């Protein structure tokens, strides 16, 4: 689904789209395989780094292959970890990362990532932790509104009890409340809109 493609043609269209504006824009390519060939194609197409996403497979081989390739070519890797812990726990993911530099998306966890403890990835020397903004700023209605947002953004069915349980499992008041303070402390130094997923840029900025 719409979490990105990295073909040379698609990247060319994306780069051309930004040509009319005096902006420096970096495009992340999809990292969803266990071999280098798709990464090589995307890098040749002009990506500035790669995004590993749980919806297309944040598996051990994918993480290791992408980080190894990125280190070789000095490009960035953003990681949206395995929210259902189907392949890896947060401890397993940290072991695969093995001290290499990575940008951890959705580190609070409501937008995705290892449940319930992805927040433990924040504050590590090799990990640039970031929030996406559905949980910022934290207000009195934040927890209540997120089940519907998760279901909508991820194509779930609100009539299926299993989908509702999965959505509710991501909503944790304590980590939502802690997130703002962790930003103030610099433990989570980055935020972004996630505007095409669980995002609401107009509420945060």
Model-found features: residue ranges?
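Active-site core of metal-dependent hydrolases
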Residues: 52-180, 184-205
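Catalytic cores of alpha/beta
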Residues: 37-41, 91
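Short beta-strand/loop segments at the ligand-binding rim of alpha/beta enzyme cores
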Residues: 22-27, 73-77
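Metal-associated gating/positioning segment near the N- to mid-region
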Residues: 1-14, 88-89
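Gly-rich Lys/Arg/Thr-decorated short loops/hinges at beta-loop-alpha junctions or inter-strand turns
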Residues: 1, 20-23, 42-49, 156-163
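Short acidic active-site motifs
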Residues: 34-38, 62
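Active-site mouth loops of central-metabolism enzymes
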Residues: 2-3, 23-35, 52-55, 169-170
């Amino acid at each position: 689904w719409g979490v990105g493609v990295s073909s040379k043609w698609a990247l060319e269209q994306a780069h051309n789209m930004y040509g009319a504006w005096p902006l420096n824009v970096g495009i992340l390519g999809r990292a969803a395989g266990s071999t280098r060939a798709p990464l090589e194609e995307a890098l040749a197409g002009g990506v500035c780094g790669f995004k590993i996403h749980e919806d297309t497979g944040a598996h051990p081989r994918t993480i290791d292959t992408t980080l190894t390739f990125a280190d070789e070519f000095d490009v960035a890797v953003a990681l949206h970890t395995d929210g259902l812990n189907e392949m890896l726990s947060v401890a397993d993911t940290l072991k695969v990362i093995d001290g290499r530099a990575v940008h951890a998306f959705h580190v609070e966890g409501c937008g995705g990532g290892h449940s319930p403890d992805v927040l433990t990835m924040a504050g590590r020397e090799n990990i640039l932790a970031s929030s996406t903004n559905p949980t910022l700023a934290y207000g009195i209605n934040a927890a209540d509104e997120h089940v519907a947002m998760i279901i909508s953004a991820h194509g779930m069915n609100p009539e299926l009890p299993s989908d509702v349980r999965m959505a509710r499992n991501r909503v944790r008041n304590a980590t939502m409340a802690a997130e703002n303070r962790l930003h103030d402390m610099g433990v989570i130094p980055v935020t972004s809109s996630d505007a095409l997923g669980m995002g609401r840029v107009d509420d945060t900025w």
